[in-house]
Amino acid sequence: VLKGPCTTPISEGFRSINVELRRQLDLYANIRPAKTIPGLKGRYENIDLIVIRENTEGLYCGEEIWLNDEKTAAKSMALVTTKASERIVRHAFKYALSNKRKKITLVHKANILKYTGGLFLNTGRRIAKEYDGKIEFWDMIIDNMCMQLVLNPHKFDVIVATNLFGDILSD
């Protein structure tokens, strides 16, 4: 056990201890399984998917500032690097291969976030070419992914995403 349960104040106070631990210890891959439990009735049966979330960058990197003294405007900075994107996408492919998974879906918002989302998407597409014929690769805009995950969860196997999107999808 790394630490006991703790909370982070909402909207003010100290920064998340989890975010700092991830950064200090370079805990870059957050692997979250989502699986139906046999015998437990639910909307779907036989769901078995994995969300792999990049855990050190994105909007959760903690780069926020107030834009004025009145604290009526704030700005957050999303950090996405080629190094971290390559590392998490390669991790997803290695995970998929070693666990006999068939498909990876990379989640992004590159249609709007041209630089950060585009960098993550293009890195994923480049790395996917190295695994062509071994693992099926798809990419999906986060908006559509949320809808598809609710309507058709059986279509997904391994999902790889930036920090914020992976957090939202896996919760």
Predicted segments, located by residue:
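N-terminal glycine-rich phosphate/adenylate-binding segment common to multiple enzyme folds
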Residues: 1-70, 74-75, 164
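Glycine-rich phosphate-binding loop
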Residues: 1-11, 135-171
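Generic structural signal for well-ordered, non-membrane alpha-helical segments
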Residues: 10, 14, 18, 81-89, ...
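Solvent-exposed alpha-helices and their adjacent loops that cap or buttress functional pockets
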Residues: 41-45, 98, 129-130, 150-153
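Flexible, glycine-rich phosphate/dinucleotide-binding loops
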Residues: 58, 113, 146
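Glycine-rich phosphate/diphosphate-binding loop of Rossmann-like nucleotide-binding domains
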Residues: 70-143
